[in-house]
Design a protein with these regions (language model features):
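Flexible loop/hinge segments that line or gate small-molecule binding clefts
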Residues: 117-158, 259-269, 273-274, 324-325
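Hinge/cleft segment of the Venus flytrap/periplasmic-binding protein
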Residues: 11-14, 37, 41-44, 48, ...
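C-terminal motif of bacterial Sec signal peptides marking the signal peptidase cleavage site
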Residues: 20-23
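Short, solvent-exposed amphipathic alpha-helices that sit
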Residues: 63-79, 159-163, 185-201, 217, ...
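Extracytoplasmic "Venus flytrap"
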Residues: 39-75, 79, 84-96, 104, ...
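Bacterial N-terminal signal peptides that target proteins for export
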Residues: 2-13
Length: 332
């Protein structure tokens, strides 16, 4: 076990540097390394260097994962961690990336569980090999059973319920919930939470890997469903595409969202979007890597076997201005 300098470690834990570290959207199975020399802050701990793999279901071009990665890289910088980041939206290929991390004998694995059935066997292999596993972002209901010692993220069902209650309060009767990745348990839970409060909710599946297709599918749905009174995107880039379709079709439908980026924050300020629920992805990346480090240097298990919630937090016109600066820095 790595030697732990308690005084320096405690100081490091007390300060979370808000850095906008450079990152690009990752997908397609590409693995990229970042470590203690990334970013501009000085190294904060003197513990032995460890290697942590973060493997997400990121699709190429989805900027949500840039924010997750920035949080992870900030924690890696602080904790003297070599971070190996990779992602693939297809469950089988994501499982292959986890297997590669096991073969590399990494010191810890952070993994998203959007497709838990595809990942359950390989996550068990990691745990059986003595590699601590933290799950993040998706699959909170399956996390513990699959062997992760904690999970960082929001409850997608609770986030959906939050949106559903807000829509119900506004008198919405027939919202359209747009799922950009079929089979993603977290996205399905979001729509289920909305439907729990607004029974007239309708599901629309789109191909999130092709924004042109998203736009045309949404436009066609708006034109064929004139009684729909709200449409909900399940991620900031998709909601912004929905906004364009609404404007192009001349629809008066209300738009709501999940997640946040700088452009969506501005859209809320100018009332193109009513509100969003933010799951604070920077915290997901940061907390997950930090939890692995804490496990390695002190045997600490963050969360007590339970999920560590990072959301949902409602952002609407009343508070969008407060978060815009952070969103523009790529932190929210």
């Amino acid at each position: 076990m790595a030697k732990f300098n308690l005084r320096k470690g405690a100081l490091a834990l007390a300060v979370v540097p808000l850095l906008a570290l450079g990152a690009c959207s990752a997908g397609g199975g590409k693995t990229e390394a970042a470590g203690a020399d990334s970013g501009s802050a000085g190294q904060a701990v003197d513990t032995a260097r460890i290697k942590v793999a973060m493997i997400t279901h990121a699709a190429a071009g989805d900027t949500f994962w840039d924010i997750v990665r920035k949080g992870a890289e900030t924690a890696a910088k602080k904790d003297n961690v070599e971070l190996l980041y990779s992602g693939d939206a297809e469950g089988g290929r994501q499982a292959q990336l986890v297997q590669q991390a096991i073969d590399q004998k990494v010191d810890g694995i952070v993994v998203t569980l959007a497709k838990p059935d595809a990942l359950k066997d390989v996550v068990k292999k990691a745990v059986d090999a003595g590699i601590p596993v933290v799950s993040m972002n998706a699959g909170e209901d399956q996390s513990k059973a699959l062997g992760a010692f904690t999970h960082f993220g929001q409850s997608d069902k609770l986030a959906g319920v939050t949106v559903g209650k807000r829509l119900a309060e506004e008198g919405i009767k027939h919202p359209i919930c747009v799922i950009q990745e079929q089979g993603h348990v977290g996205l399905e839970n979001r729509c289920a939470g909305i439907k729990e409060n607004v029974p007239g909710t309708e599901i629309l599946n789109v191909n999130g890997a092709d924004m042109t297709s998203v736009s045309s599918t949404v436009s066609a749905k708006l034109q064929s469903t004139p009684d729909a009174d709200a449409i909900v995107g399940l991620g900031a880039p998709f909601t912004l595409t929905i906004v364009k379709s609404v404007k192009e079709t001349g629809s008066k439908i209300k738009v709501a969202s999940f997640d946040l980026n700088a452009e969506l924050a501005k859209a809320i300020e100018d009332e193109s979007v009513e509100f969003t629920v933010d799951q604070q992805p920077y915290l997901q990346g940061y907390g997950s890597v930090d939890a692995i480090w804490l496990s390695k240097v002190g045997g600490f298990k963050v969360g007590g076997g339970q999920q560590v919630y990072t959301g949902p937090a409602v952002v609407d016109k009343s508070n969008a201005g407060d978060v815009t600066a952070f969103a523009q820095a790529g932190i929210r």
